[in-house]
Regions:
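Extended, Lys/Arg-enriched charged tracts that mediate electrostatic binding to polyanionic substrates
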Residues: 106-134, 190-201, 205-206
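An N-terminal, globular interaction/scaffold subdomain
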Residues: 18-114
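Loop-centered beta-sheet repeat module
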Residues: 147-218
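Extreme N-terminal starter segment of soluble prokaryotic enzymes
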Residues: 1-4
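C-terminal structured domains
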Residues: 223-354
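Well-ordered, non-membrane alpha-helical segments in soluble/globular domains
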Residues: 22-25, 112-120, 179, 183-186, ...
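Glycine-rich, mobile lid/loop segments that gate access to catalytic sites or pores
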Residues: 130, 136-152, 187
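Short N-terminal binding/cap micro-motifs at the start of the first secondary-structure element
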Residues: 11-17
Length: 354
């Protein structure tokens, strides 16, 4: 039996003298890092890696990420084949020094009734674009009336970086940039956002469009158990005809499994070190420790860990036979992080435009 863990955010994006995991008890993770075979690949967008895992060839072209993410939304019906979609996620724009930056909203910050009012206003004002809808307070969609002839950057690429470097590109770039400006005016003046600002809360004063593409059939993946909470990964799995359930280590140990653990992704993107440390300590207890024990007992034949991040992707492979190689010493995560080059913040580095 083999398990493949995908853990975006495990590689802390910033380089610092004091390691981000300093003081954490990560005995099992250090054992896995020391016992296994490690390699490090250059940066590749997370969505491209997920697509390849689900059977999409490298030359599959622009993937319909919005349609796939929407397919993975438990609260919404599957999008019809041939429909065009964009993710239209609410964000907050603010100035930091001379740059306009954006930040996203956690799932519990925007109230459902406020979201409903904002969505209704957008549909009243921008009906020519298509139809807006919200799956959750922080995940919105636009079903396009006509295809978008532009390239968009995923939201996670733009978080915390100058917005001007991640604006739409391509044939209709100016149209979409103008549309975003018009949306910002409507959202800024909306009573919901006026009330939020008056109360000292962040306004949802813009939308971030990404994931353009037509909903279409996907390649069939090799049958295996897939565990994921992330709606994009759920969409990839469902499109490939796979069953997908929430991550659970005990169930993963019952059969060959592909597991996406995105607990560390948002804290790493936002450089939220406290949340990252708390969640990493939990992963040590709920995943790394039981998987290390399963390797030692030979209940698990092999474990692969892929950790995509801005600094590249760590690939780790540990076999049950490696457990008895006593000369291999544990490798603390902070020691590994110090050996990895800093991330390149340029938009060219984030070449997975969608």
């Amino acid at each position: 039996m083999q398990i493949h863990l995908v853990v975006p955010g495990l590689i802390w994006p910033a380089v610092s003298a004091l390691g981000p995991a300093s003081g954490l008890e990560l005995t099992s993770l250090a054992w896995l890092l020391g016992q296994g075979k490690r390699s490090f690949a250059p940066f590749e967008p997370l969505d491209a890696q997920l697509a390849r895992l689900m059977g999409y060839p490298d030359d599959a072209g622009t993937l319909p990420l919005a349609a796939l993410r929407r397919l993975g939304e438990p609260a919404l019906p599957a999008p019809a084949v041939g429909t065009e979609w964009l993710c239209a996620d609410p964000v907050c724009l603010s100035f930091a020094r001379e740059h306009l930056l954006l930040s996203e909203f956690p799932a519990d910050e925007l109230q459902p009734e406020d979201v409903a009012a904002l969505i209704a206003s957008l549909n009243d004002t921008f009906g020519d674009l298509g139809t807006f809808a919200a799956a959750t307070p922080n995940r919105w969609y636009l079903r396009l009336a006509t295809p978008a002839r532009a390239r968009f950057f995923p939201l996670h690429d733009a978080v915390g970086r100058p917005v001007r470097d991640f604006l739409p590109e391509g044939e209709d770039a100016r149209l979409w940039q103008r549309t975003m400006n018009e949306l910002q005016v409507v959202l800024h003046n909306h009573p919901v956002n006026q009330a939020r600002e008056a109360a000292g809360h962040r306004p949802a004063n813009s939308l971030w469009f990404w994931g353009a593409g037509e909903s279409r059939p996907a390649p069939q993946s090799a049958a295996r158990a897939i565990q994921a909470d992330d709606p994009l990964m759920r969409g990839f799995a469902l499109a490939a005809g796979c069953t997908v359930v929430a991550p659970d280590c005990a169930k993963a140990l019952e059969s060959d499994s592909l597991v996406v653990l995105d607990d560390l992704l948002l804290p790493a993107l936002h450089l939220d070190i406290d949340s990252w440390r708390t969640r990493l300590a939990k992963l040590e207890h709920t995943w790394f420790a039981p998987l290390a024990a399963a390797l030692r007992s030979k209940r698990l034949r092999g474990l692969k860990i892929s950790a995509p991040g801005d600094r590249g992707t760590l690939e780790l492979e540990v076999r049950a036979a490696d457990a008895w190689k006593f000369w291999r010493k544990p490798l603390p995560l902070d020691t590994l992080l110090k050996s990895i080059a800093p991330a390149d913040a340029s938009p060219q580095h984030h070449s997975g435009t969608r």
